[in-house]
Curated annotation (Swiss-Prot):
This is Short neurotoxin 1. Expressed by the venom gland. It comes from Austrelaps superbus (Lowland copperhead snake). Disulfide bonds join 24-43, 38-60, 62-73, 74-79. InterPro entries: Snake_3FTx, Snake_toxin-like_sf, Snake_toxin_con_site, Toxin_cobra-type. One of its GO terms (molecular function) is ion channel regulator activity.
């Protein structure tokens, strides 16, 4: 009986994914879409211009940026594409 109860608890934890993680896009500029699993609860998309043109950086979290860099932070899976 104890074994059955323990098995049910383990299955419940695995199915509920109590350690919820976020999936964020992490490709740079116009590269093909790639994603990563993050421990943070948000994703970001940084955009700026330099001599190469418009540069886009994507990743996990919501970093501080320097003036002149556009930052968009969001809180749903793959929201920074």
């Amino acid at each position: 009986m104890k074994t059955l109860l323990l098995t049910l608890v383990v299955v419940t934890i695995v199915c509920l994914d109590l350690g919820y993680t976020m999936t964020c896009c992490n490709q740079q500029s116009s590269q093909p879409k790639t994603t990563t699993t993050c421990a943070e609860s948000s994703c970001y998309k940084k955009t700026w211009r330099d001599h190469r043109g418009t540069i886009i950086e994507r990743g996990c979290g919501c970093p501080n940026v320097k003036p002149g860099i556009q930052l968009v932070c969001c809180e749903t899976n793959e929201c920074n594409n």
